[in-house]
């Protein structure tokens, strides 16, 4: 029985239930805009009023920013409660909680793990003065460990087959990336090395294809599901065609259905040889050409079209599973097992060496924090007690987890070990789980969502009301996701319980604010450009960006009105009211440039284009030239850039001196053999100025090459900035502040690189090239804004 809701608290019945329910594990499925943060804060405040100190709660957030905002909200609420309360004892209690906020366990799971390790480091044999390894340092160390191991393995014949399988003539990135991915994925398991060692489990083979674990675990269930779906579709078509009175067409569908059913029976009986033979022997009959009444012809054509789609689906089953006989597949599985066995060995070796290397450096990464915490919490003392686990179970009166859909299995194990049987409070929305690439496991949420609905081990509360959006937005969203989201795609059935419901009824209902889908036709640039000004060279995505920019300007200048923050009056829309979602970050540069042309201010967060910025590509080219000046493309890029400032005519004039050497040698020869030439395109004054500029550049280049042998990369980069005044130069260009900040960031990245025990210009360049090759990037440096 939950208490009555206080009169001053604005909360829906379900929100109040989530705030006030006690004595059970709770899973709160909170849809977007449903007030989950408010529920979390109010529940914490209620715990405080019930006598629990704020530092007796563990509140796990997904980001440090969320933790900071949570603390600020609590601080504000407590200060407000102190002002309003006339009870001196209660005021003192709230004041005490304000003092406890800085030490409260409101943090990310990794920050909590850090605290556990700092307290119980001795239980896991960890040096207490360890330091954290950032992502870049981890990538560098990973590369170093792998290259050393790879070199050893390539000398051993037993690994030739596995290297050949994952590599090609151009690159061995295949096996490199596979080992990295296996390592990363294994770290989401409670026993990573055990998982890596068991890679071949599902590929064990005997004498019979049907009895292999791979077939039983993956092939058979998938085939049954796909064939059952086809049978259901054919049954539906037969119901429809029966009403049309077309017996010959119906007979064709019945024959199709018999064909599919025959294959399904063979699969259910694990007679894969017969299933294969059925595919080989039987063919689909041609669609009947019998005359039919004109009134049913259109319907029959629709059925025929659907049948063609089903035939393609059936043909794809053959291509996926029966393009070769089961006997040959068994032989292939034997080979796969052999290759996987060696791959497993390699992955375990890499795992051990990478962990050892981190241990030698006394470094931990985020994954290490989780696994070391798990070791500490499961460590038994001489009396068989989990002393760390019991300490936290006794200390925390409740364990609260925000964004529970983004927790992985290792994190879940940690949370279980610091919780009592019925003191967990989990909030999230499985529909918003987008961190699978970070190994989040939304099935954890789904398992509890289903179990708690039946009252097993806990209670489920659904917050479906959305207070952030208009009914038109929510109705459109529901219409889309009811068609596409289910347990297989999205981890939850998008039923009436999961559907979004309108919570904010204050929006005016007399305006037409229907959701829109805008279809932009491709412009035929060969025939006409009337529909799009300056259309030549446009890509499809650019057309879309232009349309969005025009629509924003139209709404700004109309002006379009929206509700104010208090939802009690309307105001004209401003640029900050618009958000743009793009399917890929590669569009960010285009959005920025096109919006700038329309005079629209835009803030693109973490545009992954740092290494594409002109000032950065110039500096990277210069570092390549310092490492090896006999590289034509980087050298010409530097000479053409603002660092030297040559134009195309000057570059061509230099090349006329020596056409068959490297460009660097041509530059040197141009200076050493200099004499004025009588050419129309370059007068004597320009030629002398060119010689002086090149001499100045070569003097600096030689100086920088000497510095590269004696200084750190960061010192070298700063020396270049000082010698060339490049920072001042870029500051004077468009978007100059951002350009200068990016150059400062390059200096910081170089300093960070070398602090990781990695040295040398060439290695730094290789690191940058590796990031670019893997389509990774460093974030563009942020500018302080108002």
What are these regions (language model features)?
Residues 98-105, 123-191, 301-323, 334, ...:
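ATP-hydrolysis module of ASCE/P-loop NTPase motor domains
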Residues 101-114, 166-190, 343-348, 364-377, ...:
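Core structural elements
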Residues 1-34, 38-43, 52, 266-383, ...:
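N-terminal accessory segments
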Residues 56, 177-364, 458, 546, ...:
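Conserved ATP-driven helicase/translocase motor core recognized via long
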Residues 71-79, 374, 378:
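Conserved NTP-binding/hydrolysis module of P-loop NTPases
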Residues 1-72, 136, 144, 161, ...:
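Conserved motor-region signature of P-loop NTPase helicases/translocases
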Residues 23-25, 62-65, 78-274, 364, ...:
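Conserved ATP-dependent motor core of P-loop NTPases, especially the RecA-like helicase ATPase domain
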């Amino acid at each position: 029985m939950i208490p009555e809701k206080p009169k001053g608290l604005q909360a829906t019945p379900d929100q109040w239930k989530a705030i006030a329910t006690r004595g059970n594990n709770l899973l709160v499925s909170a849809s977007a805009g449903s007030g989950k943060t408010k529920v979390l804060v109010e529940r914490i405040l209620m715990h405080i009023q019930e006598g629990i100190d704020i530092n007796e709660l563990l509140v796990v957030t997904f980001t440090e920013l969320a933790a900071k905002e949570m603390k600020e909200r609590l601080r504000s609420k407590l200060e407000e409660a102190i002002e309003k309360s006339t009870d001196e004892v209660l005021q003192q209690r709230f004041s005490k909680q304000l003092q406890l906020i800085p030490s409260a366990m409101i943090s990310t799971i990794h920050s909590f793990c850090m605290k556990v390790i700092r307290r119980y480091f001795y239980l896991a044999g960890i040096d207490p003065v360890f330091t954290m390894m950032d992502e870049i340092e981890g990538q560098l160390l990973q590369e170093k460990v792998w290259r050393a191991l790879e070199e050893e393995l390539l000398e051993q014949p037993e690994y030739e087959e596995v290297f050949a399988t994952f590599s090609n003539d151009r690159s061995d990135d295949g096996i490199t990336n596979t080992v990295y991915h296996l390592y990363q994925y294994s770290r989401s398991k409670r026993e990573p090395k055990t998982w890596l060692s068991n890679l071949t489990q599902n590929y064990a083979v005997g004498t019979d294809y049907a009895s292999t674990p791979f077939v039983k675990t993956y092939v058979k269930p998938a085939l049954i599901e796909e064939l059952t779906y086809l049978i259901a579709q054919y049954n539906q078509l037969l119901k429809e065609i029966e009403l049309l009175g077309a017996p010959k067409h119906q007979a064709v569908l019945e024959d199709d259905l018999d064909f599919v059913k025959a294959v399904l029976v063979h699969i259910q009986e694990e007679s894969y040889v017969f299933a294969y033979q059925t595919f080989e022997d039987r063919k689909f009959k041609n669609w009947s050409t019998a005359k039919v009444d004109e009134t049913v012809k259109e319907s029959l054509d629709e059925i025929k079209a659907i049948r063609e789609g089903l035939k393609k689906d059936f043909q794809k089953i053959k291509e996926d599973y029966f393009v070769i006989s089961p006997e040959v597949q068994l032989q292939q599985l034997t080979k796969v097992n052999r290759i996987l066995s060696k791959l497993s060995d390699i992955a375990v070796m890499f795992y051990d060496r990478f962990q050892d290397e981190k241990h030698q450096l006394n470094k931990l990464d985020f994954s290490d924090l989780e696994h070391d915490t798990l070791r500490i919490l499961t460590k038994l003392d001489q009396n068989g007690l989990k002393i760390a686990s019991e300490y936290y179970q006794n200390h925390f009166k409740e364990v609260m987890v925000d964004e529970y859909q983004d927790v992985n299995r290792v994190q879940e194990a940690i949370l279980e070990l610091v919780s009592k049987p019925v003191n967990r409070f989990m909030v999230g929305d499985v529909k918003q789980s987008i961190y699978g690439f970070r190994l989040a496991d939304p099935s954890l949420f789904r398992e509890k969502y289903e179990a708690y609905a039946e009252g097993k081990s806990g209670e489920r509360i659904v917050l479906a009301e959305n207070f952030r959006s208009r009914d038109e937005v929510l109705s459109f969203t529901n219409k889309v996701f009811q068609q596409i989201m289910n347990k297989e795609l999205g981890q939850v059935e998008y039923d009436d319980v999961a559907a979004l419901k309108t919570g904010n009824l204050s929006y005016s209902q007399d305006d037409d604010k229907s959701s829109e889908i805008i279809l932009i036709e491709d412009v035929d640039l060969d025939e006409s450009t009337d529909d799009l000004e300056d259309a030549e060279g446009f890509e499809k995505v650019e057309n879309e960006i232009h349309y969005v920019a025009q629509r924003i300007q139209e709404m700004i200048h109309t002006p379009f009105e929206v509700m104010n923050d208090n939802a009690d009056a309307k105001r004209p829309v401003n640029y900050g009211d618009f958000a743009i979602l793009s399917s890929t970050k590669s569009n960010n540069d285009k959005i920025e440039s096109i919006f700038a042309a329309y005079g629209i201010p835009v803030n693109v967060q973490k545009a992954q284009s740092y290494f594409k910025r002109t000032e950065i590509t110039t500096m990277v080219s210069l570092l390549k030239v310092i490492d090896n000046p006999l590289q034509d493309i980087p050298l010409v890029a530097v000479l053409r850039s603002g660092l030297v400032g040559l134009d195309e005519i000057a570059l061509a004039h230099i090349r006329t001196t020596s056409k068959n050497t490297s460009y660097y040698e041509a530059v040197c020869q141009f200076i050493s053999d200099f004499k004025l030439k009588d050419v129309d395109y370059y007068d004597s004054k320009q030629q002398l100025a060119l010689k002086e500029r090149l001499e100045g550049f070569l003097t600096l280049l030689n100086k920088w090459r000497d510095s590269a042998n004696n200084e750190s990369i960061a010192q070298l980069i700063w020396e270049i900035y000082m010698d060339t005044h490049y920072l001042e130069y870029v500051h004077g260009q468009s978007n100059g502040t951002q350009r200068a900040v990016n150059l400062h960031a390059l200096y910081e990245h170089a300093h960070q690189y070398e602090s990781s025990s990695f040295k040398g210009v060439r290695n730094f360049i290789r690191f940058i090239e590796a990031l670019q090759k893997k389509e990774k990037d460093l974030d563009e440096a942020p500018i302080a804004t108002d």
